[in-house]
């Protein structure tokens, strides 16, 4: 199956991201960039959708470090996009590609199976991501976002004995 491609962007898009978005359209994918502000000059065939409808901007406040200016920092945007992509997976919106992923050919997936990119040997990344909406990780993220504290119930630090595993696997 040739999935729709979805991504999130905050701020102006540079030439590299524009080229990558063009490559995704040229590969035959329907591409949608979600943002809080309208994005000018998107390549032909790339749609722009309102991010607020997926995950409200107010959610970013839960990620913001305490600081005097309260401005978004790069890492706050990165963390927000991690939650945003999982919300897109929960809604079955399509294949997540970071805006700097260049495609040379279409990406075909089996919609019933997870799809990840390898960043390093033995380390999955989330720059290319597809998860069925009923996947355990998607369900866990949805539950996490409903909590007052954004503390995951799965291993995330070396203080947790299970964190020494090579990868976390959801219970079956």
Model-predicted segments: where are they?
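Aromatic-acidic/polar surface patches that form glycan- and anion
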Residues: 10-17, 74-82, 152-158
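Short helix-loop capping/hinge motifs at secondary-structure junctions, enriched
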Residues: 134-140
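Active-site-proximal specificity loops/subdomain of glycosyltransferases
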Residues: 39-83
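GT-A fold catalytic core of metal-dependent nucleotide-sugar glycosyltransferases
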Residues: 77-124, 128-133
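Short amphipathic alpha-helical segments and helix-helix/interface helices
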Residues: 18-22, 85-86, 104, 161-165
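N-terminal anchoring/stem segment of glycosyltransferases
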Residues: 1-57, 133, 167-168
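Catalytic core and acceptor-binding pocket of nucleotide-sugar-dependent glycosyltransferases
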Residues: 142-172
């Amino acid at each position: 199956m040739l999935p729709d491609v979805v991504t999130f962007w905050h701020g102006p898009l540079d030439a590299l991201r524009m080229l990558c978005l063009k490559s995704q359209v040229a590969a035959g994918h329907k591409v949608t960039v979600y943002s809080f502000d309208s994005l000018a000059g998107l390549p032909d065939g790339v749609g722009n959708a309102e991010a607020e409808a997926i995950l409200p901007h107010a959610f970013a406040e839960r990620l913001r470090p305490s600081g005097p200016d309260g401005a978004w920092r790069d890492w706050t945007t990165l963390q927000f996009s991690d939650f945003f992509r999982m919300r897109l997976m929960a809604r079955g919106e399509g294949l997540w590609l970071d805006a700097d992923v260049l495609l040379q050919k279409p990406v075909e997936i089996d919609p019933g199976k997870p799809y990840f990119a390898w960043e390093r040997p033995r380390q999955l990344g989330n720059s290319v991501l597809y998860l069925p909406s009923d996947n355990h990780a998607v369900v866990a993220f949805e539950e996490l976002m409903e909590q007052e504290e954004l503390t995951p119930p799965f291993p995330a630090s070396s203080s947790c004995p299970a964190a020494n595993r090579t990868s976390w696997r959801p219970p079956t």
